[in-house]
Amino acid sequence: MIVIDAGHGGEDGGAVAADGTVESGINLAIAQDLDALLRFLGCETRMTRTEDAAIYSDGARTLREKKASDLKNRVALVNAQEGAILVSVHQNCLPSAPSVHGAQAFYNGIEGAD
C-alpha cells in the first residue's frame, strides 16, 4: 500500500509563491497525478485527501488546533495501513534565499518506527 499525502489543504494553504500560487493546490494536483500513475502500474494506493480540504477533527476550533488535528489524522491514516509506504507531497519556499530550491526526499529507515 502506498499512501499519498497531498500536503496542507483547506484553511492551511502552505507556502505562497510571489505570484500568489498556493502550495496546497499544487500538492493536490501532483498527488492526483501520482495516484493515477501508480494505479496504472498496478499499485494499491490511498490518498489522505482528494479535495482542497484539511482532515481535522470536528472539535478543532483554532487554526493551530486544526493543523495539529489534521497532522494527527494523517499519521493515523498511514499507521492504519500495515506496511504502508508514505509519499507526502510539498512545495517549499524560502524567499530570503532564492537559490535554495529543488526536490527533497525524507524516509524512515527504521522498521516499525513512528
Where are each of the predicted segments found?
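Short glycine-rich His-centered loop
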Residues: 1-20
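Active-site-proximal helix/loop segments of hydrolytic enzymes
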Residues: 21-114
